[in-house]
Amino acid sequence: MDKTPRRLTLSVDGASRGNPGPAAIGVVIKDEKGATTLKVSSSIGRATNNQAEYTALITALREARKLGADHVDIRTDSQLMAEQILGHYKVRNANIKPLFEEVKQSLAGFKSYGMHHIPRERNSEADALANDALDTLNNS
């Protein structure tokens, strides 16, 4: 059996209309060759933008684990979330702390991870998935 370490790239985005308000997530998981392995576009109920961002990441990490990832490379346009996970910013919001702890616990299950803050225009695929879920919610 081939036990080559599996490295996946996780692009995540959360969106909220109202902040807090109706919220949704977008996740794109790609393999080592850049091929899309999984996409998630889902509403998550009422949440803030930051709660939605964290929920997107939790979902992506859970799916990456199911796909057998050993290493994950995370891309997000949320500077706050990226800096909190890297330990550069403190988590002060009581609603974010349990989500942050869940992310940290999940990350500990991987051999390694990278966290990258990227411009929104470079996260357009995950952003579109989150907004598509919100649009579907608003039109139903």
What label would you give each PLM region?
Residues 43-51, 55, 91-94, 98:
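Residues at secondary-structure transition points
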Residues 2-51, 62-66, 70:
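RNase H-like nuclease fold core
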Residues 15-19, 58-138:
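RNase H catalytic domain
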Residues 1-3, 97, 140:
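N-terminal intrinsically disordered, compositionally biased regulatory/targeting segments
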